[in-house]
Amino acid sequence: MFRLVFHPSREIFRHIFTKWRGIMSKNFKLIATLVAVLGLFVGACGGSGVNKDAGQAAACPDGDNNGDGVTAGLVFDIGGRGDQSFNDSAAAGIECAKSVLGIEFSESSPNDDGSNRAELLQLQADNNPIVIAVGFLFAGDAATVAANNPDTNFAVIDDAMMDFEAGGPIADNAAGLTFAEHEGSFLVGAAAALKTETGTVGFIGGVCCFGLIEKFEAGFTAGVKAVNPDINIISQYITEFPDFDGFNAPDRAKEIALAMYSDGADIVYHAAGGSGAGLFEAAMEVSESSGSKVWGIGVDSDQYNTVDEAVREYVLTSMLKRVDNAVFLAIQSHIDGTFQAGQTAFGLSDDGVGYSTSGGYLDDIVDELEAFKADIVAGNISVPDSME
C-alpha cells in the first residue's frame, strides 16, 4: 500500500520552517508576503481562464463503498480548484473518495494572504471527522487545531507532521503525507534527455533555497545525466525563499522559458505551480514562430489534461505527484480504522510519483523509462534529493 519513511535532514528543515512560520504568523505584514504558497508539493495558484472542474484525469483507486454517512473536509492551498496542478490533484482525490467510497465532502480555500487557515481548519473539523489540508504551510495550524479536536483526524500534504523533540508524530490524530518528488523527476529528466534534439534542456523552479523544489531539480538533473552526461542543463528559479510569489508568476515563468529556448533548450521542466502556465505559453509561441517544436514538462497533475487546449500539444509529459491517491488513501484509512499518525511517504514503488504518457509523445521511450523505474525501485539507482 504505502510506507512510513523518516528523512531526518529534510524533515528537520521542515521542523525549523514550521517554527519560523509560527513566528511569522504573529506579524501580518510579514505573512502577507506568502501570497502564493507551495502546494504538494508546491502549491499553486490558478491563472486566468482555468477550468474550475479540472483535476480528475487519472483513474480512481479501487475501494469498497463503505463510506456511507462519512463526511470529509478539504482545505485547499491558495487558489483552490482550477490551478491545473496541485490543488486540482487534491480535488480529484476527494472526488474519487466520493464516487468510490461513498463519502460526502465540503471544501474551502484560504484568503489571498492565507491568514485564515486556522479558522478554515476548525470550521471543517466542526463538521467532519477527517480534514485534509493541502500544503505544508498548514502544518503549524493543523497541529494546533488537531490538539484541540482529538476526535477528528487531520492529514497535511507535504509536511511530515512529526514532533522531532519527542521523536514521534506531532499528534495521534495528525498525519503527514510526503512524496519522493526527486524519483519522479528523475524519470522526466531521463525522458527529456532521450527526446532532446538540441542537447540542451531547462529547469524552472518556483521558489529557491528552502529545500523542497531542489528535490525536483536534483532528480531531473540526475535523470538527464543518467542518459547522457554531456547534455547541457539550464536552471533558474523565479523567486527565493521566503518570497513565495514564484508559484503564481506565469508571466515571469514565460519570460524565463523564452530565454531558455533562445539559449538552445528545446525541453523545459517546471516545478513552479501555477507559474507553469507561462512555460507552456512560451513553448507554443516559440514553436509557432520558429517552425521547430519545443516542449514543456508539467508537474503534479497530468498537465496534458489540465492546461488550456491551445497549449496541450506542447506538454511532453508531466511528473505525477499523486496527491489524489494520498487524499483518497487518507480518507479510506479513516473509514477502515487504520489511520496512521506521523509521516507516510509515497514514492515510485507505490506509484506515489511517476510520469504521464498522455499525448503519446513518449511511446517510443517508455521501455527505457520503465527500466530506469525498475532500477530505482530495486535500489540499483539512488536518486539524489538535493543539489549538493
Which ranges hold each PLM region?
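A residue-level marker of the well-folded mature domains of exported/periplasmic proteins
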Residues: V50-E388
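Bacterial N-terminal signal peptides that target proteins for export
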Residues: I23-A32
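Hydrophobic helical h-region of N-terminal Sec-dependent signal peptides
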Residues: T33-V37
